[in-house]
UniProtKB/Swiss-Prot annotation:
Taxonomic lineage: Bacteria, Bacillati, Bacillota, Bacilli, Bacillales
InterPro entries assigned: PHb, PHb_sf
Stretch forming the signal peptide: none
PANTHER family: BHLH DOMAIN-CONTAINING PROTEIN (PTHR35796:SF3), HYPOTHETICAL CYTOSOLIC PROTEIN (PTHR35796)
CDD domains: PH-like_bacteria
Protein name: Uncharacterized protein YozO
Gene3D superfamilies reported in the protein's UniProt record: Bacterial Pleckstrin homology domain (2.30.29.50)
Length: 114
């Protein structure tokens, strides 16, 4: 799953340094500006805006996510996205054009409904 092969990706090797004991990378997807990593325990991504100088690495445990929404490409808006809603904040992530969001939805549903 994911657009990167977890075992071969240099991005995966960088992310492995951020993992805790017993945590493993399940999939990595390309975002419009960066990437998002789904592990067996949480989601890791940068919360940044394209023109902002600040990049904040976000570690979001699945248990903190209250709901999510998938934004599909439309006729006049080719971007696809994901909204992750927590009690305190909503994160809006824009994916690369060729990302299969049904895969992303399946990964999230697996973790949130179990």
């Amino acid at each position: 799953m994911g657009i990167f092969s977890v075992s071969r990706s240099t991005d995966a090797k960088k992310l492995e340094a951020l993992l805790v004991e017993g945590e493993r990378i399940e999939s990595i997807y390309k975002l419009r500006v960066d990437q998002i990593c789904f592990t067996n325990k949480r989601i890791i991504f940068f919360d940044n805006k394209m023109f902002s100088k600040k990049k904040v690495r976000v570690f979001l445990p699945y248990k903190t996510i209250e709901s999510f929404a998938i934004q599909e490409a439309g006729m006049f808006d080719p971007d696809t996205g994901l909204l992750l809603m927590t009690r305190s904040k909503t994160f809006e992530l824009e994916f690369a054009k060729d990302t299969d969001l049904s895969e992303v939805q399946a990964v999230l549903t697996k973790h949130l409904c179990s």
